Amino acid sequence: MSITVEEFKKEISLGIPSELPELPQYDESVNHAPKRKEILSDSEKKLAVRNALRYFDPKDHKFLAKEFSEELEKYGRIYMYRLMPRYKITARSIEDFPHKSKQAAAIMLMLSNNLDHAVAQHPHELITYGGNGAVFQNWAQYRLTMKYLSEMTDEQTLVLYSGHPMGIYPSHKDAPRVVVTNGMMIPNYSKPDDWERFNALGVTQYGQMTAGSFMYIGPQGIVHGTTITVMNAIRMIQNSENENRSKLFVTSGLGGMSGAQPKASVIAGCVGVVAEINPKAVKTRYSQKWVDEVFEDLDLLIPRIKKAVENKEAVSIAYQGNIVDLWERLAADNIKVDIGSDQTSLHNPWAGGYYPVGISFEESQKMMAEEPERFKEEVQKTLRRHVAAVNKLADNGMYFFDYGNAFLLESSRAGADIMKNEKEFKYPSYVQDIMGPMCFDYGFGPFRWVCSSSRPEDLDKTDSIAAEILEEMVKDAPSEIKQQINDNLKWIKEAKKNNLVVGSQARILYADAEGRIKIAEAFNKAIKDGEISAPVILGRDHHDVSGTDSPYRETSNIYDGSRFTADMAIQNVIGDSFRGATWVSIHNGGGVGWGEVMNGGFGMVLDGSDDSDRRLKSMLFWDVNNGISRRSWARNEGAIFAIKRAMDANPNLKVTIPNLVDDEILNNL
């Protein structure tokens, strides 16, 4: 429904209206979340409805109680579809949002982007990506949060408990405008079924990473990381044989995050073949031109792959079907696959993150809700077949890596032949081999920004500024980080040509602390000078140097025994909050799954002021060097180099450096 800006502002200021809107018709054309596992007892179902009714006037309780009970029965959750706005949710210009605080308006823009139909995976269920990465639990929370943000000042802070707006509280100008927590659980109650139960009760949510922290920028965010990963994987195997052919990269997933893989394959210059079982996801990526070609028949796909490889094409091909069928056919036909991975949502294996082979998409969705134990058994059977086919191709020279989606972990739990020994997997995580030692240890990670004007010309200006900064930095950069800077310089120069924007006018760029600070300073000056027309919002993925403690992904290249600890992520969000972040977040889960990860992020609004300049220098320096310090203490060579360099540059930084012990001393014990 199209409305004027003034009508939009009025809608936001209403919050939860006293006269409730009509219940909308269920829209089958939208990609919906599957029905969630039925896990609540009869008394717990009543508690879930009681909890939901807290948002509403008692005069509406009788009919809403029946409606919410039916929603819970039909979908496994209470989404409050009745309150879903009729206006289009999108990253409008910052001035279109009603506000007393420009910082709060920027947050409204960012959370709106996460719910844009062009961006979100299941927009009507408030899921941005990953099958269960939620912005809010229900539409009442959305409406109330937007109302609070429109009313608050720079002397207040909004507190969000797993999507629930607890309230706005007195604070001060240097405090965050919003503090977000998602899925914070007593450690003993952080198993997957605990998420199912407590989310169904309406008391917690899984925010993934940038979903619940309002920092998702569409698949562009993961395109860059995937491009870097694939490029470096190609470099790792390049010397093994000098073939006059394209490299073949095979993987799965065309969802919110995994949908980046085909675009990244083309940018990296290889043949990318991506399997996806959900036809709506395939259609979305094909219509966005993130996939070049689509096949449903393996008999047609295999010859096309051979031709693309032989012709040295850089092309992305989607296989609409189950990834295991594809792997088994490639293995049976003895096709040489150079690089393999997986981006199914195995952090969420029993609720739509992974589909069993030999069972249709529709049958699987029905089974996961009605026969969850049988569904789990079928998934684990499929994982065993999946790994067997991968092993056969790996024996033939394929380099396979886990893309941080819990593939190795869930395969091991399924009893697949995935272990090298009792403690180690056969295959590395991409962080162990590539992202950790080449990027995170040196402080390089997914820095990003959004132009709050929503004008493409402002984004063009930021691209130009960032390129100029990197061109200067690379001249004097030490050899250890020249390649990282050059890769990102190439990326930013080609970003517009690669047509990466989906949703907000955003850009991602892997940079270290020095690069982030210099780029942010230059943006702030350009805003002050009127070269950029409106504030710029800085952020990053939680998947970064310091933001995430995740033993099977971000911290998988930590070998001092501390990879199962979470001090780094907690220290990071606390440190960001008092160094100038506009909003901060800390989440349970993200990437590998609920109970497996602790991760956090931030947002920072640059408005051209001296205050912004002061905050960005303090916060961005900490936000990167916290993680380098931890990685250095774990004896990671690149991190020791990076933190010593940081101390040389800033005399106020003093970090404890590890003393390295001679192996012979320990061997003689």
Regions flagged by a language model, labelled:
Residues 657, 661-669:
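Intrinsically disordered, low-complexity regulatory segments
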Residues 299-519:
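Core active-site phosphate/anionic-ligand binding loop and the adjoining beta-turn-alpha structural block
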Residues 281-283, 410, 546:
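Short, charged/polar "capping" segments at the starts of alpha-helices
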Residues 207-231, 235, 241, 245-248, ...:
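Catalytic or ion-translocation cores adjacent to nucleophile or general acid/base/metal-coordination motifs
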Residues 157-162, 180, 251, 274-275, ...:
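General beta-strand structural signal in soluble alpha/beta enzymes
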Residues 151-156, 269, 336-339, 392-399, ...:
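Structural alpha-beta junctions
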Residues 1-235, 240-242, 435-585, 592-593, ...:
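N-terminal ligand-binding/catalytic initiation module
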